[in-house]
Regions:
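Active-site metal-coordination/substrate-binding segment of hydrolases
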Residues: 65-136, 141-147, 152-163, 185, ...
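Acidic/His- and Gly-rich active-site-bordering loop/insert found
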Residues: 3-103
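Acidic-enriched catalytic cores of C-N bond-cleaving enzymes acting on peptides and small amides
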Residues: 179, 196-201, 220-250, 270-345, ...
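A short beta-alpha structural unit
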Residues: 17-21, 264-265, 299-311, 347-351, ...
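Zn-dependent metallopeptidase/amidohydrolase metal-coordination segment
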Residues: 9-12, 336, 343-356, 421-477
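Active-site-adjacent substrate-binding region
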Residues: 226-228, 233-249, 401-444
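His/Asp/Glu-rich mid-to-C-terminal helical/loop segments that flank catalytic regions of hydrolases
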Residues: 158, 224-241, 269-273, 318-325, ...
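Fold-level recognition of mixed alpha/beta catalytic cores in primary-metabolism enzymes, strongest
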Residues: 137-227, 235, 239
Length: 485
């Protein structure tokens, strides 16, 4: 694993490897914050943790370059904690195990954390290199981006000093992002009083798994399967045809990841167990056919389990199943003027039912505020009909594109000069912190770019080694050629 430190450019890869050894799942950032502060002290640059738990670093201009515009390099320190079903990894205590697989860097059994660890590693490389030529440089390494962009949302006004912001959280080398979608978290809850299970009933845990999952913004347009939405189809028919009752449900664990696994414990008359298992096999065949060419590993597994003492009341069960069934999931609309770009979507990310409580979590995204409001009200209507309480949180606006951006055209020119190709200007459906930061610092000139990564937020996350070196070359060259104020 340590051979990753020897990849080129070593200044980035050694820092990235060091980051993989520091636990940093969203919500548990104390260790990585201290790691970054210790790094800054060793590098001899000013650094502090701000009231929003972000880490800010400042490096003065190189001699003779003091009049250049100040640049803020921005990335987020947290990572999405996903692991394979068989993994025993503890994200709060264990290091990630990166490894080289041909042209890619991957992780063993978990997310890699290249989103956004490679961006942080590049910032570290800039901060510690005394030979680079640049104007004033700041680093803004934000907290808890993956769970609600809390570090950016709580960023104090007046803290940053720069004129240009380079966000290093994009995942397609050669593409320069100048706009992104806004988003909002929607949580629907319903408490209920459990009822006793029929003492003669059996219980079966039905699991849908083996789906690809993925980033609910960047990959929502691919039509990947959502384990929660597949499972509800099976469960509803089991209730109707096998006299099944719902005892519990658990599906998904991250608001911004497409769920790749969901499971429900059903109780039912013992004589209907065989019919349930046959029904599950029929649904598996349907799912495999539906997702041909998209999902290759779908599994539907039925496992006999101990019969729980309590289950969901029938009326509440039916309301919850209707809510899950009716909840919109996936693309709502493409941008009419850019039909290849998603405008509005929703992701039924997390379902937890059991013990007298139920909760559904959805992340809705849109580049239009009116359409974001539309999908929120659509989902509210669905959940209200089921008697659920609906709350929204973490709303952030979209990042409006500025195709006349001075830093954009500098990057495009230097990309062409360095690599002989034209860069691609892009608007992403993913949420980036740029929109929130621009709301607090509207004078900033902002572009996002980075090396190529695939399948972020999943256990197949990987970084393309060959794109990190040119990314580093462009970043250095851009800092050197930033214009004067």
């Amino acid at each position: 694993m340590s051979e990753i430190k020897n990849l080129n450019p070593t200044c980035i890869w050694k820092n990235f490897y060091a980051l993989t050894q520091v636990p940093r799942p969203s919500g548990h950032l104390e260790k990585v914050q201290q790691f970054l502060l210790d790094f800054a002290k060793e590098a001899g640059v000013e650094a502090f943790k701000d009231p929003a738990d972000n880490i800010v670093m400042r490096k003065p201009a190189s001699p003779g370059m003091e009049k250049k515009k100040g640049v803020i390099l921005q990335a987020h320190m947290d990572m999405v904690p996903q692991k394979t079903p068989e993994s025993t990894h503890n994200f709060e205590t264990d290091p990630i195990q990166p490894w080289i697989d041909g042209e890619w860097v991957k992780a063993k059994g978990t997310t890699l954390g290249a989103d956004n660890g490679l961006g942080v590693a590049a910032i570290m490389a800039i901060m510690e290199d005394k030979t680079l030529k640049h104007g004033p440089v700041e680093a803004l390494i934000t907290a808890d981006e993956e769970t609600g962009m809390y570090g950016a949302n709580d960023l104090p006004a007046g803290e940053l000093q720069g004129d240009i912001l380079l966000n290093l959280d994009s995942e397609h080398w050669g593409k320069f992002v100048i706009g992104s979608a806004g988003g909002i978290n929607i949580t629907a809850t319903l408490d209920y009083k459990e009822v006793e299970t029929d003492s003669e009933d059996a219980a079966v845990k039905v699991t849908v798994k083996g789906l690809r999952g993925g980033h609910s913004g960047l990959e929502i347009h691919e039509g990947r399967g959502n384990a929660n939405k597949l499972l509800v189809r099976l469960v509803r028919e089991a209730i109707e045809e096998c006299e099944a009752r719902l005892a519990s449900w658990e599906g998904g664990n991250m608001r911004n990841a497409i769920p790749f696994k969901a499971e429900a414990v059903l109780t039912l008359p013992k004589e209907n167990v065989a019919a349930l298992k046959e029904l599950a096999q029929d649904w598996l065949e349907d799912f495999v056919d539906e997702y041909k060419g998209i999902e290759s590993g779908i599994e539907v597994i039925c496992e006999d389990v101990e019969t729980p003492k309590m289950e969901v009341p029938e009326e509440i069960q039916d309301n919850l199943i209707n809510a899950i069934y009716g909840c919109h999931d996936g693309v709502v609309r493409m941008i009419p003027s850019y039909p290849s770009v998603v405008e509005t979507s929703s992701n039924l990310a997390i379902i937890e039912i059991g013990g007298g409580k139920s909760m559904l979590k959805i992340l809705a995204r849109s580049s239009r505020e009116d359409m974001k409001d539309y999908i929120v009200k659509t989902l509210e209507s669905c959940f209200n009909m089921a008697g659920m309480k609906v709350e929204t949180a973490g709303s952030y606006g979209g990042w409006d594109p500025n195709p006349e951006s001075e830093i954009l055209h500098l990057l495009l020119k230097e990309y062409k000069d360095l690599f002989g190709q034209d860069g691609i200007i892009q608007v992403d459906h993913a949420g980036l912190e740029c929109s929130i930061i621009l709301g607090k610092y509207p004078h900033l000139d902002v572009v996002s770019f980075g090396p190529t990564m695939k399948s972020p937020h999943t256990t197949t996350e990987r970084a393309l080694i060959a794109t990190v070196e040119p990314f580093w070359q462009l970043l250095k060259k851009a800092l050197e050629d930033i214009p004067e104020k």
